Amino acid sequence: MIIRKNESDHRSPYALYVLGSLPDENVKSAAIVGARNCTSYGEQMALQYGKCLGHAGVQVISGMARGIDGAGQRGALNGDGTTFAVLGCGVDVCYPRENIGLYMDIQKKGGNHIGISTRNEPLARNFPMRNRIISGLAEWILVIEAKEKSGSLITADFALDQGKDVYALPGPVTSALSQGCHETDPAGSGNTDHTGRTDG
């Protein structure tokens, strides 16, 4: 149901644990994902896009990871918006610990945390499932900085498989952190410029 409205996708998780409530299906939602070890440019773009989406009343979905994910969610809060963190660990576990301030702010400002377990530390096997939940909850995905092989592109692939739009923010052609964005499958996806317009 919430993971995908298309009945052809049957690989749903056993259960979701939610601290609060799930995103409102009657309100637009978008995911912002990208590199953990992002550049200052990527971080500023994530903050800017997150703030614009939050200000526009769009629910921002992400994984509360360091780097792009966390910056996009901080931006949403700065825009007086609502953001939801999908965690690859217990819903009551803050990971990474450095984002404890963001973890608390999300709850204070009306957002919530969604986990695939309770009281579990993050495990590598949890993150592909976490990425799929992110794409399932969002209507479209924005990728800001991603290497050629990254979890962010896994999220983008899930979204494309679900028939959703994927947008990638271009960066310097010499940057390894932008290579994944430049090579994002153009089928159902597009590039976006700094004004938020798309060419896809």
Placement of each model-derived feature along the sequence:
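Glycine-biased, small-residue-rich flexible motifs in mid-sequence functional cores and linkers
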Residues: M1-G200
